[in-house]
């Protein structure tokens, strides 16, 4: 809640010089980069949808917007084609709620309502950056049901094996990327955007550290925790051959991408005709 309050303060502070408000929709696709998919951009994609509130400053060079987005990311060792990951056999999906301010900087002056292609201000490329509150919730499929992973302490967090507290589901991320926008009419605008998010957690996929002792984990955190901690184990019982080995790479934080189309509607009708 404290993180969200700070973001809202930033939002209202930036409204002082804002002009030309817009509301809009965002729809697109997602992917993640992390321990289960360390290198492959654009694979194992999922969806993102949400709402946008935007203000274009009167100079035509800068726009401020507030994102309210809901998306989902996923990763699966089985789809990696890497032998070590195939043996590890972990998978996850996580919903992401994202709320936060973003600043767009236009390459060329952009005029809301100017939809004549032969005139300045019709459209422009832009780049953007900001800061967002994100809420994640990694889950894994087990016996036909999706199970929340954070409460299970799959790496022994909060047990006698691991002094670390369970990781936080609420985080801050840094969105940035590029896009292009154009006016469709005096009120409608369309943008195409590619964005990455840098996070400060390595647990978007619930994978980061070492394999715990599975028998002890089952005793202290439950058999379900042990079953989802090491999915390379045989179904007949717990296999502690991986105990103490690297389950993930704690030195690399997780990333995700939200990319797609934005359709925005201006609250103030802007004429494309010159005034006399």
Located regions from the model:
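Predominantly the C-terminal beta-signal and adjacent terminal strand-loop region
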Residues: 185-276
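Outer-envelope beta-barrel architecture signal
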Residues: 19-23, 60-64, 95-97, 121-125, ...
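Residues on the lipid-exposed face of transmembrane beta-strands in outer-membrane beta-barrel proteins
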Residues: 25-29, 51-55, 101-105, 129-131, ...
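Outer-membrane beta-barrel channels and translocator barrels
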Residues: 57-60, 108-110, 183-185, 268-270
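Bacterial Sec-dependent N-terminal signal peptides
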Residues: 1-26, 267
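Short glycine/proline- and aromatic-enriched beta-strand/turn motifs that initiate or cap beta-hairpins
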Residues: 19-56, 138, 254-260, 264-270, ...
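Gram-negative (and chloroplast) outer-membrane scaffold detector with strong preference
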Residues: 60-62, 66-151
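Extracellular loop and loop/strand-boundary signature of outer-membrane beta-barrel proteins
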Residues: 33-40, 84-92, 113-115, 159-166, ...
């Amino acid at each position: 809640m404290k993180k969200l309050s700070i973001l809202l303060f930033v939002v209202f502070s930036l409204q002082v010089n804002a002009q030309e408000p817009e509301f809009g929709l965002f729809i697109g696709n997602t992917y993640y980069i992390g321990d289960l998919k360390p290198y492959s951009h654009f694979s194992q994609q999922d969806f993102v949808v949400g709402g946008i509130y935007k203000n274009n400053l009167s100079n035509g060079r800068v726009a401020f917007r507030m994102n309210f987005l809901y998306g989902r990311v996923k990763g699966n060792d089985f789809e990696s084609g890497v032998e070590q990951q195939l043996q590890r056999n972990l998978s996850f999906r996580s919903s992401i709620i994202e709320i936060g301010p973003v600043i767009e900087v236009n390459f060329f002056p952009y005029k809301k309502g100017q939809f004549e292609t032969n005139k300045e201000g019709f459209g422009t490329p832009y780049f953007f950056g900001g800061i967002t509150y994100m809420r994640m919730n990694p889950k894994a499929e087990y016996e036909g049901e999706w199970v929340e992973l954070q409460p299970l302490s799959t790496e022994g967090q909060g047990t006698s094996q691991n002094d670390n507290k369970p990781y936080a589901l609420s985080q801050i991320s840094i969105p940035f990327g590029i896009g292009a926008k154009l006016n469709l009419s005096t009120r409608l605008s369309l943008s195409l955007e590619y964005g990455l998010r840098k996070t400060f957690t390595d647990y978007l996929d619930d994978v980061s550290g070492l394999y715990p002792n599975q028998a002890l984990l089952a005793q202290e955190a439950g058999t379900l925790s042990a079953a989802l901690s090491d999915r390379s184990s045989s179904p007949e019982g717990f296999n502690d051959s991986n105990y103490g080995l690297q389950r993930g790479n704690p030195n690399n934080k997780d990333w995700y991408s939200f990319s797609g189309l934005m359709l925005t509607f201006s609250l103030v009708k802007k004429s494309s005709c010159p005034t006399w």
